[in-house]
Amino acid sequence: MVKKKKKVFAFDIESNALYDDITKVWCIYIFDVETGERWGYRPHQIEDGIRKLTEADVLVGHNIIDFDLPALKKMYPSLINYHFNVFDTLCLSRYLKPDRIGDSPEYPKGDPRRGPRGHGLKQWGEFLGELKGDYGEQEEAWDAFTEDMFTYCEQDVNLTVKVYLFLCELTGFDPYDPPSLYWKM
């Protein structure tokens, strides 16, 4: 019997604030891990982006359990009223090496088990040779949607996919049929 591949979408959102302070989702960017198809949604298309997310069997992201999905649930409760199967790269990074310092002598330089200096997407980008970008370093950057913000969101998804594929290879997970957590709010 041939096992059906799961539809795995990596995604990210950008918003005007974090956690309880969020009042606006500016954009969503989605990447189909198998086909490489991409979809980007700007402020007037957020509901379309959420509907696209519902087509996935598994959602992949960096900190989606703690931020992205709760933010979407807060801002669009009528559209986020069911479960998702999720693979959070931040959670797995922390699980695999909770004391990650990056320069640990237990593994030689170049050994993939050595990992980045921390668990953040920026640290992973430095480790994998794909920089996250520097958008948003000024506080007012998140006050209004810009195309630079949209490009930053896209780059976060590109990097998240690289982290995801790296972690799948490291753990032996099939990136097209990954283990996932059941998430419901």
Swiss-Prot record:
InterPro entries: 3'-5'_exonuclease_dom, RNaseH-like_sf, RNaseH_sf. Keywords: DNA replication, Exonuclease, Hydrolase, Nuclease, Viral DNA replication. Transmembrane segments: none annotated. GO terms for molecular function: 3'-5' exonuclease activity; nucleic acid binding. The keyword Glycoprotein does not apply. GO terms for biological process: DNA replication; viral DNA genome replication. It comes from the Viruses. It is an enzyme of class 3 (hydrolase). Pfam families: DNA_pol_A_exo1 (PF01612). SUPFAM superfamilies: Ribonuclease H-like. Its EC number is 3.1.11.-. The keyword Hydrolase applies. Probable 3'-5' exonuclease involved in viral DNA replication. This is 3'-5' exonuclease gp74. It comes from Escherichia phage Phieco32. The lineage of its organism: Viruses, Duplodnaviria, Heunggongvirae, Uroviricota, Caudoviricetes.
